[in-house]
Amino acid sequence: MQETENDILKRVRKIEIKTRGLSNEIFAGKYHTAFRGRGMSFSEVREYRAGDDVRDIDWNVTARSRTPHIKVYEEERELTMMLLVDVSGSRMFGTTDRLKKNLQTEIAAVLAFSAAQNNDKVGCIFFSDRVEKFIPPKKGRSHILMIIRELIGFRPESAGTKLSEPVRFLTNVNKKRCTTFILSDFMDSTGDKSALDDALKIAGSKHDLVGIRVYDPRETELPDVGIVELKDAESGRKVWVDTSSRAVRDHYAASWQRRSGEIEATLKHNRIDTAMTVSYTHL
């Protein structure tokens, strides 16, 4: 039986309470780790002292003054977290008691409330094969609850996925460095790998990107249940397959593993800070 929106709202309320003690747990821990050593802004240039990091040397000033100088940075007091949430058709997949959409909402809630604990701003970008909705970063519990309500009730215009679109949008609207969590199955229906690589490379030079993969176990392999009709949630394409055939099941599993490997390679190539694979289990 699928959960109702009231069920999810009840869980969100429980999550809000739970996150008060999650600072060293799974998602809150990842949040703190992602921000550790981040959010540094330029403060001043001063002469080099023994023990200073040579990577901070300002070579232009050093050349002009003929004395080693370094750039000094200070930690910014106000940090920003962005959530890039995949709202394409594939998020409505679910073979157990919950949809992928519901799990995404829970993860987003934990991350957002963790940011609130640190008095940080939280913003959100909903995307399919386009940017569906942009919620500018703000502070406060009421703002986070608004984001979660939007996640629960939002109806996208498109069912497809184009990951490069929200990443480009992030680069354009967020000039200040932030940590960004991308919540998606990372199955790009356009197959435009070069566009995604380019977008991630540019965004990664300005922001800290964290990939969180959300999937259902039944997406990885087919059960042996005879002849069934499969439908692509994003393209709407339907096909009949004989799941009693070992060859068919093996081909399906191999295809998923291949695509999963390509996703991991893309994230690694673009130096995504953390690529978490989240199986479809209860938090």
Say what each PLM segment does.
Residues 1-132:
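An amphipathic, basic-hydrophobic helix/alpha-beta surface used to engage anionic
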Residues 25, 257-275:
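Subset of Sec-pathway N-terminal targeting signals
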Residues 59, 85-88, 124, 170, ...:
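DG-centered beta-turn motif at the end of beta-strands
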Residues 121-150:
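Short beta-strand-loop
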Residues 143-178, 190, 216-217:
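Von Willebrand factor
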Residues 177, 192-196, 200-233:
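Helix-loop elements that line ligand-binding/catalytic pockets
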Residues 222-261:
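SAM-dependent methyltransferase
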Residues 281-282:
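Conserved small/polar residues in nucleotide/adenosyl-binding loops
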